[in-house]
């Protein structure tokens, strides 16, 4: 595919339209990103990227119901959108909807094999449910994906709790998100 053809591709155009909101989000400007992405979603309600990154911005603000709604909209437009599935799954986990979060993560694993983000999602949700053996399986597989140090240390901490080496800390369900 030539670069000219890629720019004319409707999916590429939708991605480009969402770039300003993505940049604001990456710069830590979640409120501005929300404004930008809401504007884009109103202008182009078929833009799955607007809804996905809007979900991410709401997640950053801990506005989980709004985040979930945005991720679901992205998935209505693009049912196979892995990023939106993972975002929805992490949001469900933060809302305490562990079974639904696990199902979402497993859906990603069915299509993506050993996706690190999905392994973390499923393992963390099982851990939060107290299903230690299932959590251990997924979290150990997650560590095999060579994750970033911060998340790897968090997962090592969960595994230490599972093995009985340390006691869980208060608020153990509030974990770092990918």
Regions found by a protein language model. Give the residues of each.
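Helical anchoring/docking segments at protein termini
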Residues: 1-4, 10, 171-178
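Helix-start (N-cap) detector for alpha-helical repeat units in TPR-like alpha-solenoids
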Residues: 14, 48-49, 82-83, 116-117, ...
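TPR/TPR-like (Sel1-like) alpha-helical repeat modules
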Residues: 116, 127-153, 157-164
């Amino acid at each position: 595919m030539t670069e000219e053809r890629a720019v004319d591709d409707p999916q590429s155009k939708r991605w480009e339209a969402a770039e300003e909101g993505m940049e604001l989000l990456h710069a830590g400007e979640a409120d501005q990103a929300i404004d930008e992405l809401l504007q884009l979603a109103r202008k182009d309600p078929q833009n799955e990227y607007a809804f996905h990154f809007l979900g991410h911005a709401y997640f950053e603000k801990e506005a989980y119901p709004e985040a979930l709604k945005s991720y679901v909209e992205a998935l209505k437009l693009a049912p196979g959108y892995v990023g939106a599935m993972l975002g929805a799954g992490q949001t469900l986990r933060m809302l305490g909807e562990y079974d639904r979060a696990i199902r979402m993560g497993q859906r990603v694993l069915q299509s993506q094999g050993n996706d690190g983000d999905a392994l973390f999602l499923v393992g963390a949700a099982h851990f939060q449910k107290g299903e230690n053996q299932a959590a251990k399986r997924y979290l150990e597989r997650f560590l095999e994906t060579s994750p970033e140090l911060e998340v790897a240390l968090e997962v090592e901490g969960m595994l230490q709790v599972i093995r009985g080496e340390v006691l869980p800390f208060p608020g153990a369900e509030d974990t770092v998100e990918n």
